């Protein structure tokens, strides 16, 4: 459907209209604001189920809804494996984990995340996601993982996202994904985020296109965006192929 020019035009018009109404702020996951479109939440769920990662790395924490979503999916993987193998397990203990990075984890958000039932699967790291010291902490926290999935959703300028891709994409395992959110900024009208430094020509999509041109280990999987139609991550589903 994503190849249909008429549907594509309608989709861009709709996304532009609802973006002005802060559509992504209307949803929660297990009680925490997730700040994602429902279609992208479904896509994230599908990827986690398909890939079955040991570790999910996320840049950008905000209220923690995305961390909680990833952690809950990892919990469901544990439950599914226990059922298949006929084993019992402690649901509060898991080898799977979510690593969240944010330059400023607000105390009330940290407290809410730490009180959440999914907290045992989450580790939060405060610092710039592109600071070498922060990147080193993430690498150490992910050490030993065989299957890694990455979600990039923090600062949306070209330079920042490019640095994130250079830092975190190499951690992605073959067959898994680095998903870059808010590439849709390039497709929205100029000035759609007039209170932010990103805009057309300076955003995650421009960073993706610049980065992937030099990284043949990854390819853009457009089948996902063509299926979703409504997504904030067009050209942002990057699959590691070698």
Task: Describe the predicted segments one by one.
Residues 1-42:
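Mobile, glycine- and charge-enriched loop segments
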Residues 30-32, 41-242:
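S-adenosylmethionine/decaboxylated-SAM
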